[in-house]
Amino acid sequence: MRYILNNNVEGTSALLGSTVATAFLQPFDFLKIRLQGSGFASGGDLNKFKRVGVIDTCKNVLKNEGIKQFWRGSSPTIVASGIAWGTYMHFYEAYKNILKSKYNVTQLNTFDHFICAVGASATQVFITNPIFLIKTRMQLQTPGSANYYTGIFDGIKKTVKVEGFKGLYKGVIPSLWLTFHGGIQMSSYEHIKFYFSSNSGKSLDSLNASEIFIASSISKFLASTILYPFQVVKTRLQDERNIPNQNNVRVYNGTKDVIFKILKNEGIIGFYRGLVPNTLKVIPNTSITLLLYEEIKKSFNYIINE
């Protein structure tokens, strides 16, 4: 047990913290995905563009699909988030240790943290993209949708059958752009933590819950706001409805086409669809995840060193 924990403290701590946080905040993730994927009417008719907001989306879901729909895709969301955070933090700490050993230092600077975070994010993308793709499609589908997914494995099976193995990696390019999200978030998080530590005289491991909450909230807000448009582009590419419709016309043909059509039909604001529910979800989610991560990591380290 101690051997396993000693080699997976960060990954296991992040996985557990993310699982708890994601389960409580699932409805906000559902709304974010619905709003990011909105813009064109069902069937991909470019002449039926319409704008929808948070309130209208909530009303439509409650009226036509029921309250349970807010938790549709919760299983893949929880699984995806847990694996993503666990994988990310495991490799983030691993890359940090590599640089510390290379430079023979105990504390890395902000740029080093940025590089480690981007590297960890890229590694995590290739491992988890198929799961996030199925999660996204399950949240965008409605009862009666073509190729309706009943679960993660059913979604993977149908995706491979219809689109081939490469279909599981739709949206991977904008996902790789989003590796800078992890870079901005974690370098900011580490910098703010170091600021609190320097001004209070406490060690980084001794920071209290409020300091961790502030550091995680600010860092997540910065990263999310700056790079949010890439999330919208990724969601549009992954949306199952963007496969040829009944008229055999594709809504989007690649990343450049998505960007062009969003600008043409929705304007700049189209790149920020779902930002409000996303902010309401990701900031508390990240704060809770990192709070639990830090506390669980302390507990695991105590067990290992006991």
From Swiss-Prot:
One of its GO terms (biological process) is transmembrane transport. InterPro entries: Mitochondrial_sb/sol_carrier (IPR018108), Mt_carrier_dom_sf (IPR023395), SLC25A32-like (IPR044712). Solcar repeats lie at residues 5-98, 108-195, 207-299. It holds the Pfam family Mito_carr. Residues 32-72, 135-163, 233-278 are mitochondrial matrix. Residues 1-10, 90-113, 185-211, 297-306 are mitochondrial intermembrane. SUPFAM superfamilies: Mitochondrial carrier. GO terms for cellular component: mitochondrial inner membrane; mitochondrion. Mitochondrial solute carriers shuttle metabolites, nucleotides, and cofactors through the mitochondrial inner membrane. Transports folate across the inner membranes of mitochondria. Belongs to the mitochondrial carrier (TC 2.A.29) family. This is Mitochondrial substrate carrier family protein M. The gene is mcfM.
